[in-house]
Amino acid sequence: MAEAKVVFLHGLHQRIVEAIISFNPAGFTTLVVDGKTAEAPQLEAVKDADFIMVFRARLSDQVLRAATQARLVQLLSAGYDSINLKLLRELNIPCANNGGANSRAVADHAVLAMLSLYRRVIAADRAVKDGRWAAAIDGMNSFEMADKVVGVLGFGNIGQKVARRVQAFDASVQYYDKYPLSPERERALNVRRVSLEELFRTSDIVSCHAPLTADTHHIVNAQRLALMKPTALIINTCRGPVVDEAALVEALQQKRIAGAGIDVFEQEPVDPGNPLLTLDNVVLSPHSAGTTWDTWFRRADFAYKNMRRVWDGQPPQAVATDYDL
């Protein structure tokens, strides 16, 4: 019986690549291709590929069209905004994300940002190292999570894990999602769905966990930021363009909201002139929320099992369905 051919297009360290392809199952062969190379090697590699596995490599339309035998594009990421889903639909090739494999890491990071802002961890660290001891903490500028309302924008795998984590700190959770949970599921998670406007108006923290689509582009805009409490925080660990960055900078500069935890930016790597870099009421990280050593094993395990499902004639799991990008 013929082996299934997987082409792995990536922009990763070799040690990570080796960890991922160690999950290659019997009956599969994986061809590793540097996703940062010229297009020609990619075109040659995919022409007889059964599966294309991708991380940190942008698939051009030409490469997708060349993959005439492909049964699935399998992403190792949660987001799918870098893939032309409309073209894949025309080509009848499904695209799957990582099935929540990095959801724990992203949820951890989102809560880390909340706590860092509330407890002024970065300012306190800097003060102690500078010999100013407790200069950053005056007894009036640090806060607890308990009894706060956390509004989760986008309530999929990551959003639901954020809910569980903040509830452990005795915060309550409300959410907005295009696709509401069943009443039974809401009761089980102890959450309630609210309108977008209510989410921004009544939350102490708004944490963004939506995919980037036409609907969610700049869903956090000047009008919605204006609804927020002056004591509120906004956290973004999903995709930069979900937040109108210029509007956010203005709200932060004018102290119309208290702070922001930002892992993703409209331009990445971030422009050295980005005003966010100059503000002391923000905590920033380099799109690293989902990138832990632990996640690679879950990503790889899910990806190869999903490709195996398709090879065995079953439908793939975690298929992206938003084609309005």
Question: Model-derived features: where do they sit?
Answer:
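Phosphate-binding beta-alpha-beta segment of Rossmann-like dinucleotide-binding domains, i.e.
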Residues: 91-93, 99-149, 164, 183, ...
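Glycine-rich Rossmann-fold phosphate-binding loop(s) that bind the pyrophosphate
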Residues: 155-156
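An N-terminal-biased, well-structured beta-alpha scaffold segment characteristic
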Residues: 2-96, 221
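N-terminal Rossmann-fold NAD(P) dinucleotide-binding loop
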Residues: 159-160
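Rossmann-like dinucleotide-binding domain for NAD(H)/NADP(H)
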Residues: 95, 222, 231, 237-325
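Short beta->alpha connector loops at strand-helix junctions that form conserved
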Residues: 55, 76-77, 94-104, 196-197, ...
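Rossmann-like adenosine-cofactor binding region
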Residues: 63, 178-275
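Conserved beta-strand positions in the Rossmann-like core of class I SAM-dependent methyltransferases
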Residues: 174
